[in-house]
Amino acid sequence: MDSRSRLEDNPNEHAVVVVTGAAGAVGSRVVRRLVHDHEGIDVRAVDKANVDARPGLDVKRVDLASDDLTSVFAGATSVVHLATAVTPDVNDPSADELELAIVSRVLDAAAEVGVSHVCVLSTAMVYGAWVDNPVPLTEDADVRPNPDFPWAITRAAVERAVLEWGSGREAAVSILRPTAVVTADTLGRLAQVLHTARVGIAADGDPPVQYLHVDDLAAAVVAAIQTRFDGVANVAPDSWIPPDALADLEGPQARVRVPAWAARAVAAVRQRSGLAPIPPGIVPYTSHSWVVANDRIRALGWEADYSNEEAWVVSHDPSPLEQLPARRRQELALGAAAALAIGCAVGAVLVLRRLRRN
């Protein structure tokens, strides 16, 4: 990154930062940090949902899919695109198409008004979860999301579009790849899907995991804005949670280990029936490591306030089961696992009978 691109190295330039998705969990925190902690930056909050008005904040209620964005972005020096139409727990091709169409509209408008910096959120899942992944993955690793997980594939497509836009243009492009994000008392959508996929009937494998608090992600976005970072950066706390430590945090779980192909089949059935939001493509991410290094984002002056373990703890509201003594929880977990195994066997028999009838 060229240090001359830093905001503090250009005191004569008036910074106007547009934040899309400003009503969301990440966007609202980014807006709040920019308004409260960074004098000399005008912040324009863009969302089709309501955004709380506050001094120093210009709020625009806009539908990114249809409204004129050139007028909304006029005068902006940075566009931080945090709005999204897709979630990791839903496979919707039309939403994927809309996501890419909105990205294209945002980039076209940014080019039209002469924006000099664009920042977007991707995901560490674009590296894919593969048996040969190094631990940890750096930004130099290939982008190869698992082919049957549409959400990660779409994030990789967003990255390509943004990088192509920045190629040959006098503008900095920041792409941030966070790991699974959590908030206070709540797992994020991705973290919840991963957790659900690892209990019950789960694939073999116990990879290390990472959890990123949403406040730390917002701080990383602000660091990219402040430095006008030009490049790709992973966002995760230092290190990761090894399997044995995660087991201690979670306590006994009802879990039946099966081959990956069987776990995928079960996930497909659970998703189609509405029992659980587990896309089959998430299964490899519960079997193989995809933890990432954070050296590059730390070089911008960013540091996580929450460790992986702390992020997990603050996001986790103990259930009545988890408040029972450890021995009793273990007994219940074993009983539940046995019930799951019996259920799987019965289900397999019923499926075979149906196939024979057909």
Language-model features, listed with the residues they occupy:
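Alpha-helical substrate-binding/gating segment
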Residues: 191-199, 206-241
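NAD(P)-dependent short-chain dehydrogenase/reductase
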Residues: 166-210
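Mid/C-terminal beta-alpha module of Rossmann-like enzyme folds, strongest
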Residues: 220-280, 322-330, 353-356
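NAD(P)H-binding glycine-rich loop region in Rossmannoid oxidoreductase-like domains
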Residues: 54-105, 109, 113
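N-terminal Rossmann NAD(P)H-binding glycine-rich loop of SDR-like oxidoreductase domains
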Residues: 14-39
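Amphipathic terminal alpha-helices
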Residues: 307-358
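Conserved Rossmann-fold NAD(P)-dependent oxidoreductase catalytic core, especially the SDR/UDP-sugar
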Residues: 105-150
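Catalytic helix-loop patch of NAD(P)-dependent Rossmann-fold dehydrogenases
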Residues: 131-181
